[in-house]
Regions:
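Short functional linear segments
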Residues: 1-59, 65-79, 83-84, 124-131, ...
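ATP-dependent carboxylate-amine ligase catalytic core
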Residues: 10, 40-50, 76-172, 188-190, ...
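Nucleotide phosphate-binding/pyrophosphate-handling subdomain across enzymes
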Residues: 51, 155-158, 167-178, 182-186, ...
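Short Gly/Thr/Asp-enriched flexible loops that form oxyanion-binding sites at enzyme active sites
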Residues: 70, 165-175, 454-457
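Beta-strand->loop->alpha-helix junctions that form or flank phosphate-binding loops
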Residues: 84-87, 214-215, 229-249, 269-275, ...
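Acidic, Mg2+-coordinating active-site environments of NTP-dependent enzymes
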Residues: 122-129, 152-159, 174-267, 281-304
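C-terminal helical cap/extension that packs against the catalytic core
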Residues: 217-227, 232, 252, 324-326, ...
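Short, flexible loop segments at boundaries between secondary-structure elements
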Residues: 390-392, 463-522
């Protein structure tokens, strides 16, 4: 295995420039699906998409967590890994990881500058034919392949952006195709039935490959199975060839016994909460077994070491303990239900303060109905909703969220509305801290909300100035709003410190993906 060290030198100006150039390109939802533009780009770069074997992952929920588990297991086998996932929480470099860490700023910027002339050539070729230039997601997919070839890596873990057949990542030939649980999401792009969505996702199954599927709705499973047979691919399904044998709660996560394709693995510690993460672990284990051929068990000590190192930011992530603050990026009803079950099991709170923001293309009514069922109808806990929005142009306005929550059956007395996320967070945390019984804050509903909350809460209390999902000029204006001052004061109060004025240049941060980005929320 090749070893490489990186200078730990951040380059925020370079990242901001490159990210701006990416954001200047069209988002995926503004054009018809295609693969020829990405295929042309990777070909003129020397077929960089063939530089390493690929494990390709699609599905509706659990893709990123499964990708991280696969990565960790491969790292435990001393393989050099490249992982491509989307979207990011705080920095665009998170989308492209080497050996489990975001690619260094210097590498991200250098490789982008090296491939940009070739991307421009493809842009010109397609423009001459009256077709759109490379989009944001097409371009960053090509960048990922180029970085993985530049490193190089031993194996690529490749997460689909949206769908499968027409996703930019599908120019790669995955030797293992992983399908996480499939449900209804992105219906505006993939179709409004499970059959249509499953057919699209089955498109990543390659000839003579290996399909590893989570437990699925029978209609979905049938489509995946038929596709695998047509492609002469091997296949294995959770609950049939592999799965979770036993599961028990443990401090900081859970203890699992997993049945893989070729062996059983008892007492595996997974530092993530929830039955759904146990199922993701079984999916990841089977995928890695399949990568190594599928006919021999892996060494238990290596599997144990791999799972012990798994982290999945923004997935039931406890970011603060006093008061308890948990972030979860679930953004559709299926994901919210799984996360809610896990949250209640892991934390057993008597008071739940939920800060919720949802993007416009999502099933907001379905999300609120699940929240009501999980936290109001089926528990004795006190539940309050703090409705707000990220800075994404796609975010549903808090007042509109309130109407949807009321339609979902929530009592208006437990709902409060905030124009700014920092204010909603601050008030929810203050209320949770001073409850007489166990209380905590759950932030959920959107990857963009989670990313912004993570940035806000990761800062020292006296420096907690809101970093909005906007361009730098807008950030400067936002840094002086009343809500920012309130957030800083309350955060300082919670930390027992006096708030102090922060120089404007210290309050600025890079913009997160906004409405010009790919609409995917993994």
């Amino acid at each position: 295995m090749s070893e490489m060290s990186y200078p730990a030198i951040p380059d925020p100006e370079g990242i901001e420039r490159v990210y701006g150039e990416l954001l200047a390109r069209a988002p995926e939802n503004k054009m018809a699906p295609r693969l020829d533009a990405v295929r042309r780009a990777v070909e003129i770069l020397g077929d960089v998409h063939h530089a390493a074997p690929v494990i390709h992952i699609t599905g509706t929920n659990g893709k990123t967590s499964t990708a991280r588990m696969i990565e960790s297991l491969l790292l435990a086998h001393d393989l050099r890994t490249g992982r491509f996932t989307s979207p990011h929480l705080e920095s665009v470099t998170e989308r492209i990881s080497i050996n489990g860490e975001p690619v260094p700023d210097a590498t991200f910027v250098r490789v982008w500058d090296e491939i940009l002339p070739y991307l421009t050539l493809v842009d010109e070729e397609f423009a001459a034919r009256g077709e759109p230039k490379l989009t944001f997601f097409e371009s960053i997919t090509v960048l990922a392949f180029a970085i993985f070839a530049d490193e190089p890596v031993d194996v690529v873990i490749l997460e689909v952006g949206i769908g499968g057949s027409w996703d930019s990542t599908n120019v790669a030939d995955g030797i293992v195709s992983v399908v996480a649980p499939v449900g209804l999401d992105h219906t505006d792009m993939l179709g409004d039935s499970l059959a249509e969505i499953a057919t699209e996702k089955a498109g990543i199954i390659k000839p003579d490959g290996y399909l590893i599927s989570a437990a699925q709705d029978p209609e979905v499973a049938t489509i995946l199975l038929d596709t695998a047979r047509k492609q002469n691919a091997k296949y294995a399904f959770e609950g049939v060839e592999f799965g979770v044998v036993e599961r028990a709660r443990a401090v900081g996560g859970q203890l699992l016994t997993l049945r893989g394709l070729a062996g059983e693995y008892p007492e595996i510690e997974l530092p993530l909460h929830g039955e759904h993460q146990g199922q993701n672990a079984s999916l990841a284990l089977a995928a890695v077994e399949a990568f190594f051929g599928g006919d021999r068990a892996l060494a238990r000590d290596v599997v144990l070491a791999g799972f012990a190192q798994v982290r999945s930011p923004g997935r039931l992530e406890m970011i603060r303990s006093e008061p308890l603050v948990v972030l979860d990026a679930a953004h559709n009803p299926h994901g919210v239900r799984a996360a809610s079950t896990a949250f209640k099991e892991a934390f057993e709170l008597s008071h739940v303060h939920a800060v919720v923001g949802i993007l416009g293309e999502k099933d907001a009514l379905g999300i609120f109905e699940v929240l009501r069922e999980e936290y109001v109808d089926s528990t004795d806990a006190t539940f309050r909703l703090y409705l707000s929005a990220s800075e994404s142009s796609r975010a549903i306005a808090p007042e509109e969220l309130q109407e949807i929550a009321l339609d979902a059956g929530f009592d208006e007395n437990i709902i409060t509305v905030y124009d700014h996320l920092d204010e909603a967070l601050a008030i929810a945390m203050e209320n949770a801290l001073f409850e007489q019984e166990t209380a905590g804050v759950l932030v959920t509903g959107s990857v963009t909300v989670i990313g912004e909350a993570r940035t806000l809460l990761a800062q020292p209390a006296q420096e907690s100035t809101a970093q909005h999902n906007a361009e730098p000029e807008e950030l400067a204006e936002a840094a002086e709003t009343d809500s920012d001052e309130l957030f800083g004061e309350i955060m300082a109060e919670l930390a027992g410190e006096e708030p102090r004025e922060i120089p404007l240049e210290d309050s600025l941060g890079l913009p997160l993906a906004d409405g010009t980005d790919s609409p995917e929320e993994s």
